Design a protein with these regions (language model features):
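Short glycine/serine- and small hydrophobic-enriched flexible loop segments
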Residues: 84-92, 122, 196-203, 300
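Structural recognition of the beta-strand scaffold that forms the well-ordered cores
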Residues: 49-52, 75, 107, 119, ...
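Active-site-proximal beta-strand/loop segments in catalytic clefts of secreted hydrolases
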Residues: 53-56, 109-112, 120-124, 164-166, ...
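Short, well-structured active-site flanking segments
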Residues: 88-106, 117, 208-212
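Active-site SXXK
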Residues: 73-95, 108, 277
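Structured C-terminal helix/loop/strand segments within mature extracytoplasmic catalytic/sensor domains
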Residues: 21-34, 42-47, 186, 190, ...
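N-terminal leader/targeting segments and the immediately adjacent pre-domain N-terminus
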Residues: 4-67, 90-95, 138, 142, ...
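Active-site-adjacent helix/loop patches that line small-molecule binding or acyl-intermediate pockets
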Residues: 22-33, 45, 100-179, 187-192
Protein backbone atom coordinates (compact mmCIF):
# COMPACT_ATOMS: atom_id res chain seq x y z
CA UNK A 1 0.00 0.00 0.00
CA UNK A 2 2.85 2.38 0.83
CA UNK A 3 4.47 1.72 -2.57
CA UNK A 4 1.15 2.31 -4.34
CA UNK A 5 0.65 5.57 -2.46
CA UNK A 6 4.15 6.74 -3.36
CA UNK A 7 3.59 5.82 -7.00
CA UNK A 8 0.31 7.74 -7.10
CA UNK A 9 1.96 10.74 -5.45
CA UNK A 10 4.74 10.72 -8.06
CA UNK A 11 2.23 10.44 -10.92
CA UNK A 12 0.22 13.33 -9.49
CA UNK A 13 3.36 15.45 -9.19
CA UNK A 14 4.32 14.69 -12.80
CA UNK A 15 0.81 15.48 -14.05
CA UNK A 16 0.73 18.75 -12.10
CA UNK A 17 4.13 19.72 -13.47
CA UNK A 18 3.02 19.08 -17.05
CA UNK A 19 -0.18 21.06 -16.44
CA UNK A 20 1.77 23.97 -14.96
CA UNK A 21 4.18 24.06 -17.91
CA UNK A 22 1.32 23.94 -20.43
CA UNK A 23 -0.41 26.81 -18.62
CA UNK A 24 2.83 28.81 -18.57
CA UNK A 25 3.22 28.22 -22.30
CA UNK A 26 -0.30 29.59 -22.80
CA UNK A 27 0.43 32.74 -20.79
CA UNK A 28 3.69 33.26 -22.65
CA UNK A 29 1.81 32.89 -25.94
CA UNK A 30 -0.80 35.42 -24.81
CA UNK A 31 1.93 37.90 -23.90
CA UNK A 32 3.83 37.34 -27.17
CA UNK A 33 0.67 37.70 -29.27
CA UNK A 34 -0.29 40.91 -27.49
CA UNK A 35 3.17 42.46 -27.67
CA UNK A 36 3.38 41.69 -31.39
CA UNK A 37 -0.09 43.08 -32.12
CA UNK A 38 0.66 46.35 -30.33
CA UNK A 39 4.28 46.70 -31.41
CA UNK A 40 3.32 49.70 -33.55
CA UNK A 41 1.98 51.31 -30.37
CA UNK A 42 5.35 50.64 -28.72
CA UNK A 43 3.91 48.32 -26.06
CA UNK A 44 6.89 47.04 -24.06
CA UNK A 45 7.26 43.85 -22.01
CA UNK A 46 7.70 45.98 -18.89
CA UNK A 47 4.27 47.55 -19.50
CA UNK A 48 2.33 44.29 -19.45
CA UNK A 49 1.69 41.91 -16.54
CA UNK A 50 -0.49 38.79 -16.68
CA UNK A 51 -1.47 36.13 -14.16
CA UNK A 52 -3.72 33.20 -15.04
CA UNK A 53 -5.16 30.69 -12.56
CA UNK A 54 -6.79 27.56 -13.98
CA UNK A 55 -9.71 26.63 -11.72
CA UNK A 56 -11.15 23.69 -13.63
CA UNK A 57 -10.08 21.64 -10.62
CA UNK A 58 -10.79 24.18 -7.89
CA UNK A 59 -9.15 22.00 -5.24
CA UNK A 60 -5.89 22.05 -7.20
CA UNK A 61 -5.59 25.48 -8.86
CA UNK A 62 -2.65 25.97 -11.21
CA UNK A 63 -1.05 29.38 -11.74
CA UNK A 64 1.12 30.87 -14.47
CA UNK A 65 2.24 34.44 -14.99
CA UNK A 66 4.15 36.94 -17.09
CA UNK A 67 5.82 39.63 -14.95
CA UNK A 68 3.31 38.56 -12.31
CA UNK A 69 5.29 39.88 -9.35
CA UNK A 70 5.88 43.39 -10.72
CA UNK A 71 4.52 46.12 -8.42
CA UNK A 72 2.17 48.39 -10.34
CA UNK A 73 -0.14 51.24 -9.38
CA UNK A 74 -3.49 49.37 -9.39
CA UNK A 75 -5.96 52.24 -9.80
CA UNK A 76 -9.43 51.00 -8.81
CA UNK A 77 -8.47 47.32 -8.70
CA UNK A 78 -7.36 48.01 -5.11
CA UNK A 79 -11.05 48.27 -4.23
CA UNK A 80 -11.24 44.47 -4.41
CA UNK A 81 -8.86 44.33 -1.43
CA UNK A 82 -10.91 46.86 0.52
CA UNK A 83 -14.06 44.84 -0.20
CA UNK A 84 -12.53 41.68 1.25
CA UNK A 85 -11.12 43.54 4.26
CA UNK A 86 -14.54 45.05 4.96
CA UNK A 87 -16.20 41.64 5.02
CA UNK A 88 -13.48 40.31 7.34
CA UNK A 89 -13.93 43.30 9.68
CA UNK A 90 -17.71 42.75 9.64
CA UNK A 91 -17.34 39.05 10.38
CA UNK A 92 -15.06 39.84 13.32
CA UNK A 93 -17.47 42.59 14.46
CA UNK A 94 -14.77 45.25 14.24
CA UNK A 95 -17.23 47.41 12.32
CA UNK A 96 -21.02 47.50 11.94
CA UNK A 97 -23.06 46.77 8.82
CA UNK A 98 -24.81 50.12 8.53
CA UNK A 99 -26.96 51.17 5.56
CA UNK A 100 -24.29 53.69 4.63
CA UNK A 101 -21.52 51.08 4.59
CA UNK A 102 -23.70 48.76 2.50
CA UNK A 103 -24.29 51.58 0.02
CA UNK A 104 -20.60 52.47 -0.08
CA UNK A 105 -19.44 48.89 -0.69
CA UNK A 106 -21.92 48.55 -3.53
CA UNK A 107 -20.91 51.84 -5.15
CA UNK A 108 -17.20 51.12 -4.66
CA UNK A 109 -17.38 47.85 -6.62
CA UNK A 110 -20.31 48.26 -9.02
CA UNK A 111 -19.75 51.93 -9.96
CA UNK A 112 -16.07 52.06 -8.96
CA UNK A 113 -16.84 55.21 -6.97
CA UNK A 114 -13.77 56.89 -5.49
CA UNK A 115 -15.87 58.80 -2.97
CA UNK A 116 -17.38 55.54 -1.70
CA UNK A 117 -13.90 54.05 -1.45
CA UNK A 118 -12.71 56.99 0.63
CA UNK A 119 -15.53 56.35 3.09
CA UNK A 120 -14.78 52.60 3.23
CA UNK A 121 -11.10 53.25 3.95
CA UNK A 122 -12.09 55.63 6.77
CA UNK A 123 -14.33 52.95 8.28
CA UNK A 124 -11.72 50.21 7.98
CA UNK A 125 -8.81 52.17 9.41
CA UNK A 126 -10.47 54.76 11.66
CA UNK A 127 -8.53 57.49 9.87
CA UNK A 128 -9.91 60.58 8.18
CA UNK A 129 -8.60 63.15 5.75
CA UNK A 130 -7.78 66.69 6.84
CA UNK A 131 -5.03 69.17 7.54
CA UNK A 132 -1.45 68.04 8.13
CA UNK A 133 -0.68 66.53 11.53
CA UNK A 134 2.36 66.96 13.78
CA UNK A 135 4.96 64.19 13.21
CA UNK A 136 4.00 62.05 16.22
CA UNK A 137 0.29 62.22 15.46
CA UNK A 138 0.98 61.51 11.79
CA UNK A 139 2.97 58.42 12.74
CA UNK A 140 0.03 57.13 14.79
CA UNK A 141 -2.38 58.00 11.97
CA UNK A 142 -0.24 56.11 9.45
CA UNK A 143 -0.09 53.05 11.70
CA UNK A 144 -3.88 52.93 11.77
CA UNK A 145 -4.04 53.47 8.01
CA UNK A 146 -1.87 50.39 7.52
CA UNK A 147 -4.52 48.09 9.05
CA UNK A 148 -5.47 46.60 5.69
CA UNK A 149 -1.81 45.99 4.86
CA UNK A 150 -1.36 44.10 8.12
CA UNK A 151 -4.43 41.97 7.40
CA UNK A 152 -3.22 40.83 3.99
CA UNK A 153 0.31 40.34 5.28
CA UNK A 154 -1.12 37.94 7.89
CA UNK A 155 -2.60 35.93 5.00
CA UNK A 156 0.78 35.64 3.29
CA UNK A 157 0.36 38.37 0.69
CA UNK A 158 3.66 40.02 -0.21
CA UNK A 159 4.98 42.82 -2.42
CA UNK A 160 1.78 44.89 -2.20
CA UNK A 161 0.73 48.17 -0.59
CA UNK A 162 -2.96 48.82 0.08
CA UNK A 163 -3.25 51.84 2.36
CA UNK A 164 -4.31 54.76 0.18
CA UNK A 165 -7.67 56.14 -0.89
CA UNK A 166 -8.52 56.57 -4.56
CA UNK A 167 -9.18 60.06 -5.90
CA UNK A 168 -10.66 61.57 -9.03
CA UNK A 169 -8.12 64.39 -8.84
CA UNK A 170 -5.47 64.63 -6.11
CA UNK A 171 -4.90 64.11 -2.40
CA UNK A 172 -4.32 66.97 0.04
CA UNK A 173 -3.24 67.39 3.65
CA UNK A 174 -2.50 64.24 5.60
CA UNK A 175 -3.54 62.08 2.63
CA UNK A 176 -0.81 63.66 0.52
CA UNK A 177 1.70 63.38 3.36
CA UNK A 178 0.84 59.69 3.70
CA UNK A 179 1.34 59.08 0.00
CA UNK A 180 4.82 60.62 0.15
CA UNK A 181 6.33 63.60 -1.69
CA UNK A 182 7.23 61.40 -4.66
CA UNK A 183 4.40 58.92 -4.34
CA UNK A 184 6.61 56.32 -2.70
CA UNK A 185 3.74 55.10 -0.49
CA UNK A 186 1.14 54.85 -3.26
CA UNK A 187 -0.99 51.75 -3.57
CA UNK A 188 0.85 48.94 -5.35
CA UNK A 189 -0.37 45.53 -6.46
CA UNK A 190 0.94 42.64 -8.51
CA UNK A 191 -1.15 40.57 -10.88
CA UNK A 192 -0.10 37.51 -8.85
CA UNK A 193 -1.58 38.93 -5.64
CA UNK A 194 -4.67 40.27 -7.40
CA UNK A 195 -5.43 37.00 -9.17
CA UNK A 196 -4.88 35.12 -5.93
CA UNK A 197 -7.41 37.28 -4.11
CA UNK A 198 -10.03 36.87 -6.83
CA UNK A 199 -9.41 33.12 -6.75
CA UNK A 200 -9.85 33.04 -2.97
CA UNK A 201 -13.12 34.94 -3.30
CA UNK A 202 -14.65 32.72 -5.99
CA UNK A 203 -13.58 29.48 -4.31
CA UNK A 204 -14.92 30.59 -0.93
CA UNK A 205 -11.54 30.42 0.78
CA UNK A 206 -11.45 34.04 1.92
CA UNK A 207 -14.90 34.21 3.56
CA UNK A 208 -17.95 32.20 4.58
CA UNK A 209 -20.59 31.28 1.94
CA UNK A 210 -22.90 34.21 2.72
CA UNK A 211 -20.13 36.79 2.48
CA UNK A 212 -18.70 35.11 -0.62
CA UNK A 213 -22.12 35.32 -2.29
CA UNK A 214 -22.44 38.99 -1.34
CA UNK A 215 -19.07 39.84 -2.86
CA UNK A 216 -19.75 37.81 -6.00
CA UNK A 217 -23.03 39.63 -6.52
CA UNK A 218 -21.21 42.97 -6.57
CA UNK A 219 -18.54 41.64 -8.94
CA UNK A 220 -20.99 40.12 -11.45
CA UNK A 221 -20.77 41.80 -14.85
CA UNK A 222 -22.85 41.98 -18.03
CA UNK A 223 -20.72 41.95 -21.16
CA UNK A 224 -23.49 41.94 -23.78
CA UNK A 225 -25.45 44.94 -24.97
CA UNK A 226 -24.17 48.48 -25.23
CA UNK A 227 -23.07 51.30 -22.95
CA UNK A 228 -22.33 54.96 -23.47
CA UNK A 229 -19.47 54.54 -20.98
CA UNK A 230 -16.29 53.30 -22.72
CA UNK A 231 -14.97 52.28 -19.31
CA UNK A 232 -17.95 50.12 -18.37
CA UNK A 233 -16.44 47.29 -16.32
CA UNK A 234 -18.38 44.57 -18.14
CA UNK A 235 -18.16 45.93 -21.68
CA UNK A 236 -14.83 47.74 -21.78
CA UNK A 237 -12.22 45.30 -20.48
CA UNK A 238 -12.03 41.47 -20.45
CA UNK A 239 -15.69 41.41 -21.48
CA UNK A 240 -14.76 42.64 -24.97
CA UNK A 241 -13.23 39.20 -25.61
CA UNK A 242 -16.47 37.45 -24.62
CA UNK A 243 -18.74 39.12 -27.16
CA UNK A 244 -20.21 36.63 -29.62
CA UNK A 245 -19.51 33.71 -27.29
CA UNK A 246 -22.57 32.17 -25.68
CA UNK A 247 -23.04 30.84 -22.17
CA UNK A 248 -20.08 32.58 -20.53
CA UNK A 249 -20.34 34.22 -17.11
CA UNK A 250 -18.12 37.06 -15.91
CA UNK A 251 -17.16 38.58 -12.57
CA UNK A 252 -14.53 41.33 -12.49
CA UNK A 253 -12.99 44.48 -11.06
CA UNK A 254 -11.38 46.94 -13.42
CA UNK A 255 -9.23 49.98 -12.85
CA UNK A 256 -7.96 52.78 -15.05
CA UNK A 257 -6.22 56.14 -14.96
CA UNK A 258 -4.70 58.38 -17.61
CA UNK A 259 -1.71 56.01 -17.80
CA UNK A 260 -2.96 52.59 -16.64
CA UNK A 261 -5.65 50.12 -17.66
CA UNK A 262 -6.21 46.95 -15.62
CA UNK A 263 -8.72 44.16 -15.08
CA UNK A 264 -9.00 41.08 -12.93
CA UNK A 265 -11.71 38.71 -14.10
CA UNK A 266 -13.19 35.37 -13.15
CA UNK A 267 -14.69 33.60 -16.15
CA UNK A 268 -16.84 30.48 -16.31
CA UNK A 269 -17.13 28.81 -19.72
CA UNK A 270 -20.03 26.60 -20.88
CA UNK A 271 -17.58 23.71 -21.46
CA UNK A 272 -16.62 23.70 -17.77
CA UNK A 273 -13.58 25.91 -18.08
CA UNK A 274 -13.04 28.24 -15.14
CA UNK A 275 -10.21 30.68 -14.72
CA UNK A 276 -9.04 33.90 -13.11
CA UNK A 277 -7.17 36.29 -15.36
CA UNK A 278 -5.46 39.45 -14.11
CA UNK A 279 -4.04 41.77 -16.76
CA UNK A 280 -2.34 45.07 -15.93
CA UNK A 281 -1.08 47.56 -18.53
CA UNK A 282 0.92 50.76 -18.10
CA UNK A 283 1.45 53.76 -20.39
CA UNK A 284 -1.28 52.60 -22.80
CA UNK A 285 -4.51 53.53 -21.04
CA UNK A 286 -6.30 54.37 -24.29
CA UNK A 287 -5.54 51.02 -25.92
CA UNK A 288 -8.75 49.22 -25.01
CA UNK A 289 -7.90 46.07 -27.00
CA UNK A 290 -4.79 45.02 -25.05
CA UNK A 291 -6.69 43.32 -22.22
CA UNK A 292 -9.18 41.49 -24.48
CA UNK A 293 -6.34 40.37 -26.76
CA UNK A 294 -4.77 38.57 -23.80
CA UNK A 295 -8.15 37.13 -22.82
CA UNK A 296 -8.91 35.78 -26.31
CA UNK A 297 -5.67 33.81 -26.43
CA UNK A 298 -6.38 32.39 -22.97
CA UNK A 299 -9.98 31.44 -23.77
CA UNK A 300 -9.07 29.79 -27.07
CA UNK A 301 -6.06 27.98 -25.65
CA UNK A 302 -7.22 26.83 -22.22
CA UNK A 303 -9.09 23.80 -23.55
CA UNK A 304 -5.79 22.50 -24.93
CA UNK A 305 -4.12 22.69 -21.52
CA UNK A 306 -4.32 19.29 -19.84
Amino acid sequence: MIKIAKTLFILLAITTSIHAQSLQDLVDRAAKTTLERFADKKLQESELSITLIDLRDSKHPVTASFHGNERIYPASVVKLFYLVAAHHWLEDKKIEQTPELTRALRDMIVDSSNEATQYVVDVLTHTTAGYELPPKEMEEWQYQRNAVNRYFSSLGYTNINVNQKTFCEDAYGRERVSRGPNGENRNKLTTDATARLMMEIVTGKIANPARTAAMMELLKREYTGQSSDPDNQGLGFTGIALKGREGIRLWSKAGWTSTTRHDVAYVEMPDGGKFVLATFTSQHANEREIIPTVARVVIDGLKEVK
